[in-house]
Amino acid sequence: MKQVDDFTRAMQGEFFCDLLRGAPYQKDHIDERMRSLKMQLTQADRPVAMASFRLPQGDYFLAEVWRYGRERLENALKNIFENGDERMYFVLLIINPHHMRLLGLPREEMTRQQVADQMKMHLSRCQASLEAYFELALDIKRIVSYDSLYALGRENTLRTAH
């Protein structure tokens, strides 16, 4: 049963990473994927926030300081960014050390502003952890909030249509 749970969790994360990568999902597709992946903790019609950021010294850290390989560093970053908040569900997409995205989805009813505020507070906690454990700085490029996952999917559709 644990393998199924781990597989389902991995598939849930992959779905959200697809959205972070810019997959142009329509409302019906989002609903169908969330149903099939048994995602009761989040609702697609609630506001979401997406942050784009980088670790300016990430390549140096990976090459010169971190001795455990890229995969373990990614796992350590996911442990920092995807945990620690009872009110929000977070998914980290590591494109490379110079480009990462974090999606924040509320586990409870929140306004768009509350979701954006929760994302900012979470990133502040993550920054403190990165500095404490790895002496790394976080360079936040932007935080964008959306009315819903559907709105994020629509924006992706418009962006990829050009």
Residue ranges with predicted function:
Residues 1-107, 111, 148-162:
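Interdomain helical linkers/hinges and coiled-coil/dimerization scaffolds
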Residues 77-78, 115-134:
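Alpha-helical scaffold within the catalytic cores of cyclic-nucleotide enzymes
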Residues 92-97, 128-140:
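Catalytic core regions of nucleotide second-messenger enzymes
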Residues 121, 125-128, 142-148, 155-162:
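Cyclic nucleotide signaling catalytic output domains
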